[in-house]
């Protein structure tokens, strides 16, 4: 039987000949066939925008191609990356859970170790995840992954599941969200079926629970999870848990669960640095067979710094815009479309002036002077731009802060820096760095 991956590669080859290159690259190329059974092909796409367009414009074509390739009538089901994760493998149970049959998974096909970009901020979490995938129930049990939204926790958890299922296709690998665990528990209580609930979860060879922070305040759920954890741990089965914060920082979490989570390894994932963000974009482009100029990668990576989802979302928008508009992939073309978010923290004008002067290795008096030297003039323009971004001061007040400059000078400076950051990556990176320093200074407690 042809695997989903091979079947989808054949389908992509056919679709590429029937669609224009911009349409194929934008709407079809990055999709993944994640399961095929009972005449239903489940295809995962990047986001809801792509999903809606595919349903309206290419649904019949997808069904036709897959029907021709398989020799059976195929119905297409489209889902996005945001699909609620469900149990993967499990024996039949009278408990009415939405389990997936053996050898079929609800995993994101892209969330594998080979597609995970390792950097300084996630290296330990990656190494620990790979270690438990290779040798579960030993050194790091449980493994507790913690970090902010969109930093790769779910990617690593699903990569572990992929790895185990590839090595042992019949293994009972359960990957569920805390909400799913809770809902299954509620169903079992309502139907007086706790025995099946406990049997199901405690029979796992490998249990991965996502978003455990949502267990707070749910006393009975915590009670059941505690006993499930103990049962699996005592049997030498691996448990992996993910949360947006460390166990000790989850409010309302029972002390005994904090103790259990802390007995293994707590691996923190931080926001990726610039080099890692660039590597993430480069790898995504390579997998999607898209050529990205280095300056575009640098621009996106320097402007989207909070998490990987935003980073990849910006890349998708850039690709969609250039493909649909039939324009070249350049910083000048994508900058107005992306309109990257800038997190601003209010700061005192004097603080901004000091930070800018230090960066350009100038004395504050030089920065506020009327000097027309190029380096002084540029630093002053940058300072005015940042003061407009990080304060509520009017243009005349900003001019006063910079030694009594005219408001038209401030307006010209802000416009010039706005245009320059869209054309020059170094300027863009400088502004990002200075804004970050200003944010930190603005958040510092007053002494």
Swiss-Prot record:
Region Domain I, interacts with DnaA modulators, residue ranges: 1-79
Region named Domain II: 79-105
UniProt GO molecular function: ATP binding; ATP hydrolysis activity; DNA replication origin binding; lipid binding
Gene Ontology BP term (one): DNA replication initiation
Region forming the signal peptide: none
Pfam families: Bac_DnaA, Bac_DnaA_C, DnaA_N
Main localization of the protein described in the UniProt heading: cytoplasm
GO cellular component: cytoplasm; plasma membrane
Binding site for ATP: 150, 152-154
Chain residue ranges for the region called Domain III, AAA+ region: 106-322
Subcellular location: Cytoplasm
Stretch list, region Domain IV, binds dsDNA: 323-447
InterPro entries: AAA+_ATPase, Chromosome_initiator_DnaA, Chromosome_initiator_DnaA-like, Chromosome_initiator_DnaA_CS, DnaA_C, DnaA_dom, DnaA_N_dom, DnaA_N_sf
UniProt entry keywords in alphabetical sequence: ATP-binding, Cytoplasm, DNA replication, DNA-binding, Lipid-binding, Nucleotide-binding
Known partners and oligomeric status: Oligomerizes as a right-handed, spiral filament on DNA at oriC.
Domain remarks: Domain I is involved in oligomerization and binding regulators, domain II is flexibile and of varying length in different bacteria, domain III forms the AAA+ region, while domain IV binds dsDNA.
Entry similarity comment: Belongs to the DnaA family.
Function: Plays an essential role in the initiation and regulation of chromosomal replication. ATP-DnaA binds to the origin of replication (oriC) to initiate formation of the DNA replication initiation complex once per cell cycle. Binds the DnaA box (a 9 base pair repeat at the origin) and separates the double-stranded (ds)DNA. Forms a right-handed helical filament on oriC DNA; dsDNA binds to the exterior of the filament while single-stranded (ss)DNA is stabiized in the filament's interior.
Protein name per the record: Chromosomal replication initiator protein DnaA
Gene from which this protein is expressed: dnaA
């Amino acid at each position: 039987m042809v695997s989903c991956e091979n079947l989808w590669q054949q389908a992509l080859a056919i679709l590429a000949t029937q669609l224009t290159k911009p349409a194929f690259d934008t709407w079809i190329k990055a999709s993944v066939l994640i399961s095929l059974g009972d005449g239903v092909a489940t295809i995962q796409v990047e986001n809801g925008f792509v999903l809606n367009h595919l349903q309206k414009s290419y649904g019949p074509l997808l069904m036709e191609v897959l029907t021709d390739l398989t020799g059976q009538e195929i119905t297409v089901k489209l889902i996005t990356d945001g699909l609620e994760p469900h149990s993967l493998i499990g024996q039949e149970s009278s408990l009415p859970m939405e389990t997936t049959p053996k050898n079929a998974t609800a995993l994101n096909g892209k969330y594998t170790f080979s597609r995970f970009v390792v950097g300084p901020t996630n290296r330990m979490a990656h190494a620990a995840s790979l270690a438990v995938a290779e040798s579960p129930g030993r050194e790091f049990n449980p493994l507790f992954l913690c970090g902010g939204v969109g930093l790769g926790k779910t990617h690593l958890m699903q990569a572990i599941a992929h790895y185990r299922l590839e090595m042992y296709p019949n293994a009972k690998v359960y990957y569920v969200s805390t909400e799913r665990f809770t809902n299954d528990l509620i169903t079992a209580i309502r139907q007086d079926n706790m025995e099946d609930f406990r049997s199901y979860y405690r029979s796992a060879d490998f249990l991965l629970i996502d978003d455990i922070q949502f267990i707070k305040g749910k006393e009975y759920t915590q009670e059941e999870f505690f006993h499930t954890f103990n049962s699996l741990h005592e049997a030498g089965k691996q448990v992996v848990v993910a949360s947006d914060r460390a166990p000790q920082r989850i409010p309302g979490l029972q002390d005994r669960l904090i103790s259990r989570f802390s007995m293994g390894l707590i691996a923190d994932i931080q926001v990726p640095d610039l080099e890692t963000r660039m590597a993430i974009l480069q790898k995504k482009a390579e997998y999607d067979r898209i050529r990205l100029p280095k300056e575009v990668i640098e621009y996106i990576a320097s402007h989207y710094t909070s998490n990987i989802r935003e980073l990849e979302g910006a890349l998708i928008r850039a690709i969609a815009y250039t493909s649909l508009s039939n324009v070249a992939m350049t910083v000048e073309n994508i900058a107005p479309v992306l309109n990257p978010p800038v997190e601003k923290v209010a700061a005192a004008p004097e603080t901004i002036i000091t930070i800018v002067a230090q960066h350009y290795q100038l004395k504050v008096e030089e920065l506020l002077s009327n000097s027309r030297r190029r380096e002084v003039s540029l630093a002053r323009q940058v300072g005015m731009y940042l003061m407009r971004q990080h304060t509520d001061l009017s243009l005349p007040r900003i001019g006063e802060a910079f030694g009594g400059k005219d408001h038209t000078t401030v307006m010209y400076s802000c416009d010039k820096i706005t245009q320059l950051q869209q054309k020059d990556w170094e300027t863009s990176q400088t502004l990002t760095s200075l804004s970050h320093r200003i944010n930190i200074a603005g958040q510092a407690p007053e002494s």
